[in-house]
Amino acid sequence: MDKTVLDASLEPLKGKTIAVIGYGNQGRVQANIMRENGLNVIIGNVKDRYYDLAIKEGFEVYDIGEAVKKADVAFLLIPDEIMKEIYEKKIAPILEGKKEFVLDFASGYNVAFGLIRPPKNVDTVMVAPRMVGEGIMDLHKQGKGYPVLLGVKQDASGKAWDYAKAIAKGIGAIPGGIAVISSFEEEALLDLMSEHTWVPILFGAIKACFDVAVKEYGVSPEAALLEFYASGELVEIARLIAEEGIFNQMVHHSTTSQYGTLTRMFKYYDLVKEIVKDEAKYIWDGSFAKEWTLEQQAGYPVFYRLWELAVQSEMAKAEKELYKILRRKVSD
């Protein structure tokens, strides 16, 4: 099988009822694009504002269990941390009675780490967008596709890969974007590696830069924030990386900048690599999944404590004042 898919047929999904479970960030976007593509879509959601929104936008909306009963295909587009409980209570009992069914996940986490184990009669596929719902819709309105990872954990019908590719087309990823053949385990590893390594390292580096510049060198908080991220330069660099490549975009910076970046990247590389290796192992062997499950069961004590430390930091307080001056969105 080719590792990339640039287009596919919708035929496997035609005539089937597709239940999108969760009308939030991904669910709303995927449901609307599939409806535009002529597919029969219903929504399964708890009775909240998203339930009401789906009705307002013209969908038939049901309790989650009822939606699964009516469907041939279900997309589980609810947060990872609540998915296991909802699956076990409202979805699993119904799947046992289905002769043939397709269950689609937008992330690999719950299946990869054994938190959800669909019955053997169910095609278990993954179509995982590599961007948030708002970004997907922006590209869709421009007639463009976007990248997704495809995976099959269980091929009960012998057609699971056909379903996965058809879903990628149905939600507007292809044509125009790219679908990369992957796996639940690979997606979960890569997603968590980002969240556990370069993202916190970047955030931590920015906070350390702020603290050192302001506290030890007397730099004004406003100047520090604007230099490190508030000006929007970081966003522009990220855009250039996506469009031109991480090293190719460096030509847009001064030679001084290029020299400083390259010398320090290689200077700290071995240190950073060891951090990445440790985190990757911790993710891959299931240790993080256990840690996160215990944190949830305990009522999120570490999560809330660290959030409080972050928002009460001097950088966060200075940011709030600067953003008021700049008339940007400020959370209370």
From Swiss-Prot:
Keyword Amino-acid biosynthesis: yes
Enzyme class, spelled out: oxidoreductase
Superkingdom of the source species: Archaea
UniProt GO BP: isoleucine biosynthetic process; L-valine biosynthetic process
Gene3D superfamilies in UniProt: 6.10.240.10, NAD(P)-binding Rossmann-like Domain
Domain KARI N-terminal Rossmann span(s) in chain numbering: 1-182
Presence of keyword NADP: yes
Keywords associated with the record: Amino-acid biosynthesis, Branched-chain amino acid biosynthesis, NADP, Oxidoreductase
Pfam (any one): KARI_C
GO terms assigned for molecular function: ketol-acid reductoisomerase activity
Entry EC no(s): 1.1.1.86
Descriptive protein name: Putative ketol-acid reductoisomerase 3
Annotated source species: Saccharolobus solfataricus (strain ATCC 35092 / DSM 1617 / JCM 11322 / P2) (Sulfolobus solfataricus)
Gene name of this polypeptide: ilvC3
